[in-house]
């Protein structure tokens, strides 16, 4: 099983950017948690982070050819990126949208996700555990598709 963990804009600033909202872990520390979790389960994982919408679209499209699922934190693109929405809708593998913070308990403009309607599901508000829960969901969906 191969999963792409895709990190969107500003996630490279984790640990420095608003730790009261996003926690004190860096992106590297979160990736290490994910790697430990996936290696224990025999899951291969690749990581990619970009602040650029087109790079994320490219990764989603490529994942359709080489991955079993995607765990995707689109960051602020969650709320308005039709390009990312269309990229998620265009691929035939499960995409789980994840967020460190609970986007539904934050500012009004963060409540709407344009990605969620085309994703397999959304996990929000569990800090770095959102990624681990997303991987579990992605794994379950990908395995059920194989059967």
Curated annotation (Swiss-Prot):
Query: A Pfam family name for this chain?
Result: DHquinase_II
Cite the annotated pathway.
Metabolic intermediate biosynthesis; chorismate biosynthesis; chorismate from D-erythrose 4-phosphate and phosphoenolpyruvate: step 3/7
Q: Where is the active site?
A: 22, 99
**Its catalytic activity?**
3-dehydroquinate = 3-dehydroshikimate + H2O
Top-level lineage group: Bacteria
The record places the site described as Transition state stabilizer at 17
**Any GO BP:** amino acid biosynthetic process
Q: EC no.?
A: 4.2.1.10
EC top class, as a word: lyase
Q: Which GO terms describe its molecular function?
A: 3-dehydroquinate dehydratase activity
Q: Which UniProt keywords apply?
A: Amino-acid biosynthesis, Aromatic amino acid biosynthesis, Lyase
Positions annotated to bind substrate? 73, 79, 86, 100-101, 110
Q: Which family does it belong to?
A: Belongs to the type-II 3-dehydroquinase family.
Function summary: Catalyzes a trans-dehydration via an enolate intermediate.
Q: Which HAMAP family match?
A: AroQ
The entry describes its oligomerization and partners as: Homododecamer.
Any idea what this protein is called? 3-dehydroquinate dehydratase
Q: Which gene encodes it?
A: aroQ
